[in-house]
């Protein structure tokens, strides 16, 4: 058969409102990759796989940074907090953020699509909703206008805005961010 591999470097460790995005699909990958959120910024990544796949001969795999005890301790502490508090917060705040961005899309024609899970949301900008022609300048303008108001945003791809706030975000910060985005988009019209 074919191996199912999930790259959860960005989407794992609670980001999507579940510990791993694979859980949303109801599947169990053969191999799962995780890093970034795993150790709260400490340099650590992991390959999680079924035993039959990970059975390698001695010396066939090595790592320059593998097994660093400080990074491993950071990962254990991170996982404890994420599992206890932040997965549920990411799910709840992600629903709030997604609903808010979808509301913005009703009022701003430049938003062509909104998609995401938990606190990992993409907002696609278009010149025209019928042709769906990408609008990279709209993303650049929004990122710059938001920065001037104290809101840090990041574009990705050709014409998509990536929204991936911290897992500790609260409703007030979500609402403030949405208000600032709305102000920037309204001023651009």
Question: Could you describe each region identified by the protein language model?
Answer:
Residues 1-189:
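Conserved N-terminal phosphate-binding loop of PLP-dependent enzymes in the Aspartate aminotransferase
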């Amino acid at each position: 058969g074919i191996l199912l591999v999930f790259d959860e470097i960005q989407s794992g460790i609670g980001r999507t409102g579940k510990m791993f995005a694979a859980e949303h699909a109801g599947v169990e990958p053969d191999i799962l990759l995780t890093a970034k959120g795993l150790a709260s910024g400490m340099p650590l990544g992991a390959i999680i796989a079924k035993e039959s796949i990970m059975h390698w001969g001695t010396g066939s795999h090595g790592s320059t940074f593998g097994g660093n005890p400080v990074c491993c301790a950071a990962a254990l502490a991170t996982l404890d907090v994420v599992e206890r508090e932040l997965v549920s917060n990411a799910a709840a705040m992600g629903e709030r953020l997604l609903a808010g961005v979808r509301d913005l899309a009703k009022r701003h024609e430049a938003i062509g699509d909104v998609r995401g899970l938990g606190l990992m949301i993409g907002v696609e900008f278009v010149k025209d909703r019928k042709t769906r022609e990408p609008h990279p300048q709209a993303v650049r303008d929004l990122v710059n206008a938001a920065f001037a108001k104290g809101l840090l945003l990041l574009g990705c791809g050709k014409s998509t805005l990536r929204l991936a706030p911290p897992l500790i975000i609260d409703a007030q910060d979500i609402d403030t961010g949405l208000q600032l985005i709305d102000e920037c988009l309204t001023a651009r019209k």
